């Protein structure tokens, strides 16, 4: 079974935390990843070489690695350069996710250049994080092995909505041949199922599983609305 086939029809859990989260730290991310594996997840998405190394030692699942690096010179921060991609690969990720939007990068590299470097120098697969249909088509043409709706709603020019961009999933499935992954604001099993009904190859869920404070807040807010 190929690496991509291992992900087909399954749940990928994004194990990430912000510095101000109570569960921030590589040991916690590794524990979340192990819990996800025990629950039946088919893959893990993780940020930073440190977290990826810790998770690699804890689970046998495929890891989609990213490295979020902010810069005053660019809005692009998800694995914004070939150097960042190399660090992700060396940490143990089998698939490297990159921001595949056409926005300029601090490294001055193009999406195509980064994808080529990942394929030829690192021998890894590429997940292209995109925000629009046009970006998904361009990412496929640039050589991406799969596209993900990760950035829909997180760029000023894409739809701003509370739930997942299922319409983008539907559009991509009709226009690209590579696997389409649904990611972003998927909070319930019903929304995940709806993504698969739209043709998603796999689904990525993060905060709805791995950020307890957000999970708690959703329950609290729902209870308040009932009063």
Predicted regions and their residues:
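Conserved N-terminal beta1-alpha1 strand-loop-helix module at the mouth
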Residues: 1-90, 126, 134, 138-141, ...
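C-terminal alpha-helical cap/extension of soluble enzyme domains
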Residues: 3-23, 27-30, 164-227
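Residues at the C-terminal ends
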Residues: 38, 90, 120-121, 141, ...
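Structural motif
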Residues: 46-47, 66, 99, 129, ...
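Active-site-adjacent beta->alpha loops and helix N-cap segments on the catalytic face
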Residues: 22-26, 45-64, 75-81, 100-118, ...
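Intrinsically disordered, low-complexity proline-rich segments enriched in Ser/Thr
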Residues: 127-128, 170
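A short helix->loop->beta-strand "cap" motif at the edges of active sites that frequently abuts
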Residues: 61, 122-124, 178
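Glycine-rich phosphate-binding active-site loops on the catalytic face of alpha/beta enzymes
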Residues: 16-18, 38, 67, 71, ...
């Amino acid at each position: 079974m190929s690496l991509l086939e291992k992900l087909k029809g399954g749940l990928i859990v994004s194990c990430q935390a912000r510095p101000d989260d109570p569960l921030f730290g590589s040991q916690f991310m590794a524990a979340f990843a192990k819990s996800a594996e025990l629950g039946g997840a088919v893959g893990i998405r993780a940020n930073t070489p440190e977290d990826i190394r810790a998770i690699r030692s804890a689970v046998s699942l495929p890891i989609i690695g990213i490295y979020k690096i902010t810069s005053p010179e660019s809005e692009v921060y998800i694995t914004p350069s070939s150097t960042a991609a190399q660090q992700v690969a060396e940490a143990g990720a089998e698939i490297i996710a990159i921001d595949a939007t056409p926005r300029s990068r601090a490294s001055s590299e193009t999406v195509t250049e980064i994808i080529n470097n990942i394929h030829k120098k690192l021998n890894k697969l590429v997940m292209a994080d995109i925000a629009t249909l046009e970006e998904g088509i361009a990412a496929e043409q640039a050589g991406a092995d799969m596209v993900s709706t990760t950035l829909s709603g997180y760029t000023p020019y894409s739809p701003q909505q509370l739930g997942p961009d299922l319409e983008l999933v539907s559009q991509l499935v009709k226009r690209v041949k590579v696997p389409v992954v649904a990611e972003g604001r998927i909070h319930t099993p019903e929304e995940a199922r709806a993504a698969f009904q739209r043709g998603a190859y796999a689904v990525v869920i993060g905060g709805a599983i791995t950020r307890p404070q957000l999970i708690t807040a959703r329950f609290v807010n729902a209870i308040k609305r009932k009063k």
